Amino acid sequence: MKIIPLASESLGVRSLALFLRIGKVGILIDPGVALGPKRYSLPPAQAEMKALAVAREKIQEYAKKAQIVTISHYHYDHHTPFFEGLYESSSIEKAKEIYTGKILLIKHPQENINHSQRKRAQEFLKNAREIAREISSADSKTFDFGEFIIEFSPPVPHGREGSKLGYVVMTLVDDGKTRIVHASDSQLINDRAIDWIIEKNPDILIAGGPPTYLSYRVGNVREVGIKNINRIIAETNAKLVIDHHVVRDKNYENFFQELDKTPQTFAEFLGVKSAPLEAYRKELHKLEKGEDVELPKGIQKFLKGLPP
């Protein structure tokens, strides 16, 4: 199994998009990307817009290599919608390129879903039905493709139990040699998600960590996240790749240091330093104005690699 992270906060955008290659088959997991429209009361900086364009191009590139596409839920940083979106770098043409002729394994569009995501799912399916090879609701199901299986969890909360953000499904891919779980936006802060991950005992766990940058609004997610992740560490031998929400916090590395085993971000999995642009949006706006700012080395290097 070849594992290729495509986009995430450590790569400058909101996403947890992943590509897997098993033999001749490509699997594209959560093919969406977005920017937070407001952070520190500021819109995305120019560097973030450039990073968004780079991430979008990468998702489109790997969509061409995929026969199977999975969608854990209907937030725009996890699927590409059929509309022109500035902060999603989306369009009807880009969506068609991703989904045409593909086997789509998707979160159930009507069950265990909140009002917002139900509307988004309906809009998605209205367009996808015309172009996809096949569409199946994935919740709690296992799909056998011969060389590998793809198994989906029951719906789990998007974050804490009772979250108003609805539900997500987690994805297990097993080719007989490697078991990888993509835990999406479970955020590792609800027991249902943790129990399922431990039961599946993956070799690699890819997950969005808790939204510690929102602790003032969502409570003690830091402590809950540390307890739950340490439980996964104690009860499995999984390699941890944790990114997404937690990397929107400037101090995410301090969170990692409190764990019994240090995770990698997507960037680190790829062998480069993390570049959490959103967390440093204030500094990026100052940089645009010609002011002197201090930025982590990972961001400095990332900025040099962006297109002009």
UniProtKB/Swiss-Prot annotation:
Highest taxon listed in the record's lineage: Archaea
Alphabetized InterPro entries for the sequence: RibonucZ/Hydroxyglut_hydro, UPF0173_UPF0282_UlaG_hydrolase, UPF0282_hydrls
HAMAP family associated with the record: UPF0282
Family: Belongs to the UPF0282 family.
Name of the molecule in the record: UPF0282 protein PYRAB09800
